[in-house]
From Swiss-Prot:
Its EC number is 2.8.1.12. This is Molybdopterin synthase catalytic subunit. It comes from Staphylococcus aureus (strain COL). Substrate binds at residues 34-36, 44, 100-101, 116, 123-125. The gene is moaE. One of its GO terms (biological process) is Mo-molybdopterin cofactor biosynthetic process. The keyword RNA-binding does not apply. Pathway: Cofactor biosynthesis; molybdopterin biosynthesis. GO terms for molecular function: molybdopterin synthase activity.
Length: 148
């Protein structure tokens, strides 16, 4: 288990939260993003995530560094699951600790936005009558390969 990682097994929240705890931290905010059944009136059967793992983990760690620069004293742990995920499964977990709660909340929100912007993870939504790749799956893979 690593502080910033891509996994294929179900995410266990406590072990990632523990990465962020020490005697200086007064707040820990843990966000979990789950697979929802309905999106814009369409019923999702399940999701399939893919990632360019080496670059994805590098980018997750970069987000942790960015957070520590913006909110000194914070500690971050981020994990994203890939493969097939069923309804209610945890797809992403972000744990951020800070001496004070406001920074932990702000940093956690920053992390999920940055994941969507820079991490080469691709999501396919599967419905009863079809499927579609969602998000930034065009371009990020080639960009990720160039950055490696």
């Amino acid at each position: 288990m690593k502080q910033f990682e891509i996994v294929t097994e179900p995410i266990q929240t406590e072990q990632y939260r523990e990465f962020t705890i020490n005697e200086y931290q007064g707040a820990v905010v843990v966000f979990t993003g789950h697979v929802r059944e309905w999106t814009k009136g369409v019923k999702t059967e399940y999701l399939e995530y893919e990632a360019y793992i080496p670059m994805a983990e590098k980018k997750l760690a970069q987000i942790g560094d960015e957070i520590n620069e913006k909110w000194p004293g914070t500690i971050t742990s981020i994990v994203h699951r890939i493969g097939p995920l069923q309804i209610s499964d945890i797809a992403v977990l972000i744990a951020v600790s800070s001496p004070h709660r406001k920074d932990a909340y702000r940093a956690n929100e920053y992390a999920i936005e940055r994941i969507k912007e820079i991490v080469p993870i691709w999501k396919k939504e599967i419905w009863e009558d079809g499927s579609k790749w969602q998000g930034h799956q065009k371009g990020n893979y080639e960009e990720a390969k160039r950055e490696e």
